Amino acid sequence: MTFNDGVRGDAGRVRTSRGRRGMAIGGGLGGGGLIVVVLVMLLTGQDPAGLLGGGGGGDAGPGQDLSHCRTGADANAHTECRMVLTADALDVYWDGVMSEQTTGAYTPPGFTIFTDSVQTGCGAATSAVGPFYCPADSSVFLDLGFFDQLESQLGAQNAPLAQMYIVAHEWGHHTQHMLGTMESVDRQDTGPSGDAVRLELQADCYAGMFIGAAATTIDPDTGQAFLREPTADQVRTALDAAAAVGDDRIHESAGREVEPHTWTHGSAEQR
């Protein structure tokens, strides 16, 4: 999926940080993070204590400079700039949806691109956790290195729309948090029809809503649509990224028996 070259981005919308290695993450996160933790545990046998827990520490210093992320052309050329413009487009889209379909106002989530580790309201996280949403501070966290892992470890294509889908999925969790959905479900209810899976599938649906409307979501600064209409091949990359983190795919990749009663994110087909 391609941004229109002339649309404008706000580099200040996204925070960056560089942290220390060997930190851990506390409970309460939402989104892809937990599924990636499970994948690492299954494929490597790594002790989860290094990934999940209360962990201390904090950000070690400033992260990547985003001052060059100004236009859609920059977003098409650089992954970090694609994140900036995607955040801008998601904010405009969800502000419109919330104002038209709910009585509440849209509050943008925080968005941090981090390297190695990051301190959050849910605890301290390493890059191994993957992208996640932390409801405690209403923020999305992402290490750009995950996109390479998406292809090398999970078997999906590291393509622009796949990247945008991942971010839009985490924004979907923010929408659930704003609407009270995240807090009203039993996230310990696992299995194909359990609350945990339903929460993830709804976030997928919200991501699809954004992608479906992206070519008609208008940059208020230029009056142009943020994005061009996606091609069928581009849509396939997003669907493949969603399927790649299906619980059954992860079990199979680890050489384990597929156990539907343990699912928290849904099967590849569901996603």
Indicate residue ranges for each PLM-predicted region.
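Long amphipathic alpha-helical segments used for membrane anchoring, targeting, substrate engagement
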Residues: 1-68
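Extracytoplasmic low-complexity, Pro/Thr/Ser/Ala/Gly-rich segments
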Residues: 3-8, 48-113
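Active-site recognition of the HExxH zinc-binding catalytic motif
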Residues: 39, 94, 142, 165-178, ...
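Catalytic zinc-binding patch centered on the HExxH motif and its immediate surroundings
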Residues: 49-52, 117-143
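C-terminal capping/extension segments of zinc metalloprotease domains
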Residues: 62, 97, 121-135, 221-271
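Short helix/loop segments within enzyme catalytic domains
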Residues: 81-87, 91-93, 97-103, 198-250
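Short pre-active-site segment immediately N-terminal to the catalytic Zn-binding motif
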Residues: 148-165, 191-197
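Post-HEXXH active-site segment of zinc metalloproteases
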Residues: 177-201
